């Protein structure tokens, strides 16, 4: 049975307009994005099927073009549309951070970094560069591969901080394993970078590790 034949109060789009997006299930939100179903399946039925196939919303959103379009009802146009929506969400978060101090909203900062790094299949290391009012200027990925104290060069981090005329920055990297517990190497690297940047009067405010669940703040853990 198509969604159009459902009672208005049960249709995902009408429920969203009346109750807000947060009140909808993952399947209902995905159904609105899909707009239509396939033969024998409503958009909601198709959404439930896709969530089951991908084992949840996050793997579906993180799927590459090949995996995404291998599923019935999903083509290149939908993939492009989804990527555009997610990029707009990231840019919305970035704009908000440019208008206020990162220190006043650490949760939003961590959410932004998670949105940037959680889909990376390998370890990456980046910096969120801040101005003298702790507002975000830009984000850069500086290193890819195994992140340790011998691989990440302080000279390159200092160089990029000075190029952006940053007053402070937030270090970040991801753990593809999903476990955010910092290693001894993570702690040593943070100390080295903090000392090197202090020589050019750039302050390291935090080191955020992105994995599954909530990102870890090394400052909040008392590790720096």
Swiss-Prot record:
Residues the record lists as binding Zn(2+): 173, 175, 186
Domain MPN, chain residue ranges per copy: 102-224
Short name of any one Pfam family annotated for the protein: RadC
SUPFAM superfamilies: JAB1/MPN domain, RuvA domain 2-like
InterPro entries: MPN, RadC_JAB, RuvA_2-like, UPF0758, UPF0758_CS, UPF0758_N
KW Zinc (keyword) present: yes
Entry keywords, A to Z: Hydrolase, Metal-binding, Metalloprotease, Protease, Zinc
Chain positions of motif JAMM motif: 173-186
GO BP term, example: proteolysis
GO MF: metal ion binding; metallopeptidase activity
Membrane-spanning ranges: none
Gene3D superfamilies from the UniProt entry: Cytidine Deaminase, domain 2
Family, similarity comment: Belongs to the UPF0758 family.
Protein name: UPF0758 protein Psyr_0222
């Amino acid at each position: 049975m198509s969604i159009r034949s459902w009672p208005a109060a049960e249709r995902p789009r009408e429920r969203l307009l009346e109750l807000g997006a947060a009140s909808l299930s993952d399947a209902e939100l995905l159904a609105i994005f899909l707009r239509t179903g396939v033969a024998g399946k409503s958009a909601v039925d198709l959404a439930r099927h896709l969530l089951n196939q991908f084992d949840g919303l996050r793997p579906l959103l993180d799927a590459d073009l090949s995996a995404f379009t291998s599923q019935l009802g999903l083509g290149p146009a939908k993939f492009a549309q989804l990527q555009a929506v997610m990029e707009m969400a990231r840019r919305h978060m970035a704009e908000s951070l440019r208008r206020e101090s990162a220190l006043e909203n650490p949760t939003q900062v961590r959410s932004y970094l998670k949105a940037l790094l959680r889909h990376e299949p390998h370890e990456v290391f980046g910096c969120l560069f801040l101005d003298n009012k702790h507002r975000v200027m830009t984000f850069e990925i500086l290193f890819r591969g195994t992140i340790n104290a011998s691989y990440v060069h302080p000279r390159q981090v200092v160089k990029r901080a000075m190029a952006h005329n940053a007053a402070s920055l937030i270090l970040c990297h991801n753990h593809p394993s999903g476990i955010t517990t910092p290693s001894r190497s993570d702690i040593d690297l943070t100390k080295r970078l903090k000392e090197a940047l202090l020589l050019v009067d750039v302050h390291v405010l935090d080191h955020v590790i992105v994995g599954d669940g909530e990102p870890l703040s090394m400052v909040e853990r008392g590790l720096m």
